[in-house]
Amino acid sequence: MTCTLRDLNSLLEICCRCPAHNPSTAFAPTTKVRVSSDVRGIFALPVQKDHKPYNGLSPEHLETMKAVSLMLDAAGPKLEDGISKAKELLEERINPELMRDALGIYLTHSKDAQQRKIFPPPLKNHPFFSTKTRRPANVAGEICTADTLHGHALLSYWRDDYDLNDSHYYWHMVYRGAGGDNSKNVGDFDRHGEVFLYVHSQMVARYETESLCWSLPLVRPWNQYDDFLENGYAPISSLIEHYGGYPPFSTWYSIRNPDMPDTLNVTIPRARLEEWRDNIYAAIRKGQFETTSKDKPLVLTRDNCLNFVGGILDAQYPSLNKLLGGCSLDEERYGNLHNYGLGKFAEMAYRNKPGEKSPYGLTISNFGAPRDPCFWRWYKHLQYYGRLAATRYPQDITAHRAEVVLSNLVVRLQDRSSPHYLDGHITTFLGPPAVNFMESKAKLGHEPYEWNVQVKSCRRSPPSKENPQTLTLRLFIAAEDLMNDYHSWIEMDRATVQLTDESAITKVRLDTDSSVARKMGNYGEPDPRYASAVFRHGWPQNLMLPVGKVEGMPFVAFCIATDDGIPDPAPAPPFHHYHDPRGMGYPFNRAWTQLTEDSTGKASIRTIISNAELYPFITSTTFKIYRTTKFETKQIIQPTTVTWFNTIRGYFKDADRACMRSEYGYDLYNYDHVMLHADAILDATASKRMPLQMGKYTQDNPDPEHPLWTVKMCENFRAWLLNGCPKGTDPA
């Protein structure tokens, strides 16, 4: 089913209702649109009892949501047009959860939104979050230790991490799938199916490594659909009102939860999913997927296998079919396994209670699904499809070797005074969680670290300034116990290097430089250089390292040099082309011919990456991660001398004050007003939306007499905010 605007009226009946309702719970009709405040207001709207439940995994609900996003886009060329239409639809009782999804897509991919730097608000703007502070709670929850919790509950601190869930929430705004025609709402994504497999496989690798740090077993994949969940799950107290839990030994219902209404395509029988599962496995083993043209199957190759396998799991048929030259994949045969599978888990927690706002379990929610332990069993199962394809289509890891010799790889703390600096080990810590951001048990972090490696060219024609040598360094880590499993390697960074002479260089990368990490601090704290939404779905900085062990847990670091360069990702649309020419997660994305063709039985990943003579473009080293505990997270953010009176007040011009008083009713010369709205001010100035330029001047061509804030000004304001907004002494 492909939705058009003509179909919208009938689809809206699924997720909205238009009876008499309390007007105070929605936007009042208005002719004036205040873009930033209206966007924040829409994302903060709670679901009311008279809203029809929204299931983000149901094809009908998804088509409605995508049609709403199209309506916002069709309302006019300016953001004001789309936001005005959103407010109109909310008056007609569109479910706010549906509108958040639709508006998030619209803002992420709208040219006007990108030019004006208006992005979807962070997760903390969701109505479930009652506070706006970025700072951890003063009264912390219990620190997580192995003798207080057992099994998957031990990892609740990791699953409930705010930054993990915020990252996942943004990922789904950028990458949309589930049967809709992406070319009609956000455009086609290059290698979208491969992205789907890679991202979720990396999530599983990180989660399993975290489990190993606590001596827990690896995740058991949900390969058998009549399996059961030994442990029950209940969302944290602030979510239990909104999403259901399930008791121990729960399993999928064979038909549907008997408490659920018999609504078409909200859930389907287990046997249908088993049929899709087996058909996809069979297609990978056979090396081809069936199409509607019996004599034109889609033949898998080394280059396309992961993209098509991932795309079919995620039901990205409209986009995939465009690659087939006139025929279509057999959707009846392969189905929509990913989303209906999550729906079967959500169905286990269904609550048939009058006025229930969201009767399903957390797996229907993009912002909260990783909190549920069943999420990880499901994605471990989906990883197996990638494993099967990766084994069937191996690769020669020398094919893209850079003509260099790598040596002296080191991963270590940045602090030279640390007792672990000379040993080349790293320290993590468990500190108090931000309970007001729905974290539980602890907050994982790490001391600042760096990695460096020596690079020397061995190219036949030596590099020079006139003829430089460009290459990419790719860094991974794995728990030493898991290093012989391709899919347990965690990607840490990719960096392009240019050599201009024969002498060896040492490439140094800080943890915050990582190309796979989010470019922001904890709790969505914006970085002025990376305010665009496209940078917000990387891996959280605080979770880049596994927690390790108190006595130190051994890890292996690996670096490979490939003969390519990776351009910086575009900060604004069009960003639909994946910028790395190699496979995602290369070289661990597929099996190695160096292993599959080995006849001695002695080859392994361990022996290959330690063989510098045969593979000089590869190097590795070992290090340990030591786990510590911090019972207090109070930090002093530099510079500490910034106060309201000596710095911040002077940042606001008379024109800024007049604009804010007119548009939003608060006074930028008033300390209390600025302190109350400091988060929004930092976000707007860091992303260059403010100070607002008038007349012939624009945000890209600002008035020299009324310039945008510099990076230093943003950093000072950030430090002032995080240090508690010190007032200082009035010089008057």
From Swiss-Prot:
SUPFAM superfamilies: Di-copper centre-containing domain (SSF48056), E set domains (SSF81296). This is Cyclopenase asqI. Binds 1 zinc ion per subunit. Zn(2+) binds at H168, H172, H200. The keyword Metal-binding applies. The lineage of its organism: Eukaryota, Fungi, Dikarya, Ascomycota, Pezizomycotina. Changing D314L: Impairs the catalytic activity. It comes from Emericella nidulans (strain FGSC A4 / ATCC 38163 / CBS 112.46 / NRRL 194 / M139) (Aspergillus nidulans). Its EC number is 4.1.99.27. InterPro entries: Di-copper_centre_dom_sf, Hemocyanin/hexamerin, Hemocyanin/hexamerin_mid_dom, Hemocyanin_C, Hemocyanin_C_sf, Ig_E-set. It catalyses: (-)-cyclopenine = viridicatin + methyl isocyanate + H(+); (-)-4'-methoxycyclopenine = 4'-methoxyviridicatin + methyl isocyanate + H(+). Cyclopenase; part of the gene cluster that mediates the biosynthesis of the aspoquinolone mycotoxins. Within the pathway, the cyclopenase asqI catalyzes the conversion of 4'-methoxycyclopenin into 4'-methoxyviridicatin. Cyclopenin can also be converted into viridicatin by asqI. The first step of the pathway is catalyzed by the nonribosomal peptide synthetase asqK that condenses anthranilic acid and O-methyl-L-tyrosine to produce 4'-methoxycyclopeptin. 4'-methoxycyclopeptin is then converted to 4'-methoxydehydrocyclopeptin by the ketoglutarate-dependent dioxygenase asqJ.
